Amino acid sequence: MKIITCYKCVPDEQDIAVNNADGSLDFSKADAKISQYDLNAIEAACQLKQQAAEGQVTALSVGGKALTNAKGRKDVLSRGPDELIVVIDDQFEQALPQQTASALAAAAQKAGFDLILCGDGSSDLYAQQVGLLVGEILNIPAVNGVSKIISLTADTLTVERELEDETETLSIPLPAVVAVSTDINSPQIPSMKAILGAAKKPVQVWSAADIGFNAEAAWSEQQVAAPKQRERQRIVIEGDGEEQIAAFAENLRKVI
């Protein structure tokens, strides 16, 4: 059973600064880290490996220069995957969901897989699109919002997901793509033994050309900016007469 767990390197939120001039975000001092939601996918993949006959877990990511960081690679491998594949190319530096999904699908096809796991979204964009797009591109079943994996056989995965007022149980034929929610597990903190052992695990570095990827994005990200801050007006209307109610309604209309 070959399981691929996808992850994304994202800027550490606490290091992101806001430029006062135009509200744009400054990522220059932000270290890269594994997207919090993908930690659940990595943990789920490694738990499934224990159930699968001859299970193997491959961590897979596409991106820019952040993926060259040796510390980041070691962090991923210390969490349980048997190997790591990173696809590094400048065009993936600010990739949007469609481009990311296309590259992940191409890389997964090259690596070979029975099951692909990913987080429901990423810590930066949280578009919640990539997992479903990968399934669509590969023309295989794709399910998101999975909160529990019940069982795994050679050809079927049975899962649960929480809907608004009910719990849905699904049997998914393999190969498939599953996007897991944060409810599925609590990611473990790697032990010192796991951290030291991560350095011995194989890492493959591919380029966009290696996976036959040469598609140009139909659109590109132009700017990421923080919401403009509005000063509070601190309008206090005293009394409960008709004039006060009318004044309240008038001020309310101005802000909606």
From Swiss-Prot:
UniProt gene name: fixA
Any one of the GO BP annotations: carnitine metabolic process
UniProt cross-references to Pfam families, sorted A to Z: ETF (PF01012)
Disulfide bonds: none
Functional description taken from the UniProt entry: Required for anaerobic carnitine reduction. May bring reductant to CaiA.
Protein name as annotated: Protein FixA
Assembly behavior: Heterodimer of FixA and FixB.
Alphabetic keyword roster: Electron transport, Transport
Biological or metabolic pathway of the protein: Amine and polyamine metabolism; carnitine metabolism
